[in-house]
Structures are given as structure tokens and as C-alpha cells.
Amino acid sequence: AGFRFVASDRTGRPWITLFASWRPLNGYRSTITAEATSRVEIQAPERRRCFSMAVTATDERDRGQPTSWSAAVDALAAGRALDASSQGLIYLDDGSDPVQRLFIVSAGNVDEGALQVAHPDRSDTDAVHDPAQAWNALTVGAFTEKSIVQNPKWNGWQPVASAGDHSPWSTTGVVFADAWPIKPDVVFEGGNGVKNAKGEVDFPCPDLCLLSTHYRPAQKAFVLSWATSTATALAARMAAIIAADYPTLWTVTVCALVVHAAEWTAQMQTHLRGASGKRARARLVRRYGFGVPHLDRALRSAGDALTIIAQDSLRPFLPKASKPNERQMGDIHFFDLGAHQN
């Protein structure tokens, strides 16, 4: 398992540091995640960060239910400090205001042996992997715009997914119960696979993959990249650029800008128009999340679209004075946009 850390330097340009890959033989995944988070923060405590975690469990048995790993991600994202003990993880609360963290987590991949021509049926039944169901994490699935096969090696093969549709690699939250969060939150480019007339699926096809730098440049400069790990790296890059351009934004605001800058592709909207009923449309949201984020939309208002960002806190419900076990309406914030003057 590797742990990626994404940040921006003091000049405002985003950069990525890849820590050496390491695979612990023992220990809880939640403990490993907490320790990895602590190590980089100790090295440079004042540096702003986005944590990109493109590693998940290999099964989908949790189906949205919390686990010790997803709970640790939720706690770390909320700004809590964790420490390992003989009884597991314990919270370290010193009374200071928590410093929230942005965790960008891959949704997880469909098993290589389970890729099917009947896409996206397999993705819709393969649930997002642990810990990507964490409420406070930005969970990233994959879509693809890559649908042109030119390599002579793949003559007679066609792309599995249509351009603008769900990547065949990406898991979804379609089978989650309604009580659990919508996951993935967003989707980024994750590549495609190829299929032939016999119903066989193959990968990787260079035409349908992304090109990235190899983690050992002395061995080779570039390597093919695909699936939700690639999509997560792209999401982390976008979040780091937003944080670098707007250093005063809260972590949750950066996350919100990524999500609010997303929109469904024309192909995704085709499925939406063909969906009959509210439940069918809800299933599509749990497949695509809120769509594909666009950096320009996050950084700048498009045309005459006004974007108002309010960073504040409130308590929407308060205990009743006469009945403390019951709740009443609490805070509400109003924003005066000014009256139009003739």
C-alpha cells in the first residue's frame, strides 16, 4: 500500500510528493492511515495538504456501512488526532480547535477478472470499497472520454464504455442502502477497456489509458495509468490547485468547490432522460456522483454566474430549555445581497 500526499509550495504552485511504497505485514488499516497522516504533519506542521489515498480494501462487503477504517478517515478529516493503543485507536483531544483535513479517496476498482461487456451492470453491483464510504472523505470514481482505438494490435476491438460514460473499472454506491452517503462524490478520467465480438474484455489498451511518470524514473520515464487510482490523482491535483490559488479557503470549502464544479456529461444525461421514476434517477446519482468537476468552474465564475462562498459555522438545532432531550430550531444565517437600485 502506498500513501500519497499532495500539497502546494510557498510559491503557490501545486506539487506532489510520493512517499516510498510500504506494505505492513500486521496492523489495522485505520492505524496505518492515522500514522501516515501524523508522520507528514510532524515533518511540516504548517503546510497545507490534501491527502490522496488510492488504496482500498479488495472487496465490497461493507456496502456503505461504517468500518474502523472509514471511521478513522472520518475522524481524521474532521480534524481529530488518533493514536494507536493495545485496544485500538484512541482519540487525542487537547481542547484546541480541530484542523480539518481533506482526504481524497478512490472508490475502488471492479475486479480485473469481472470486467464485462455488459457495462455498466457489473459496476452497479460492485459496491464502493472500504474506506471510500467515509462521510467526510471526497470519494472519487472514474468515467472516461477515451473511446478511439487506433493501435493496430487492437484491430477489431471496440471500447467497453462510450465516451463520457462510466469507466468499466469504477465501483459505485448503487447497492448502498438509502441511509448511507452518496458515493462516489465525483468522477474523473479513469480510462477504458476494449471488447471484441466474442464477448472478451482486455486491458490495458494504450489508446484508452492515461500516461503518467513512473515512480522509478531511473528504470523508465513513463507508465500507463488507469482506473480509480488515476482518477483520484487527478482529483487531488485539482484540489491542490484550488487550495494554492485561494489559500484562505477552509478545507471543507476546497472540497465543496470540487463537488460544485462538477456536472454530468451529455452521455450521463442521456441515461437520466431514460430513467423512469425517482428511484431509477437516484441509482444514477449513486453511479456518477455529482459528475465531472471542471477546474475553470471551481476557480472562476463562468460568464455571468455569480458564486458566493460563505465560510461560517452554525448549530441548526438546539435543546429545548424545558425539555433538554428534545430539539428546537437553532441558528440560521441570512445574507444580504443588496436591493436592486433603479
Please place each PLM-identified region on the residue numbering:
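A Trp-anchored, charged/polar loop motif used as the substrate-binding/catalytic surface
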Residues: 2, 24-43, 122-123, 160-173, ...
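Substrate-binding/access-modulating region of protease and related hydrolase catalytic domains
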Residues: 15-134, 147, 218-226, 230-232
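Active-site alpha-helical elements of protease catalytic centers
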Residues: 1-11, 31, 223-243
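Secreted peptidase-domain scaffold signal
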Residues: 279-342
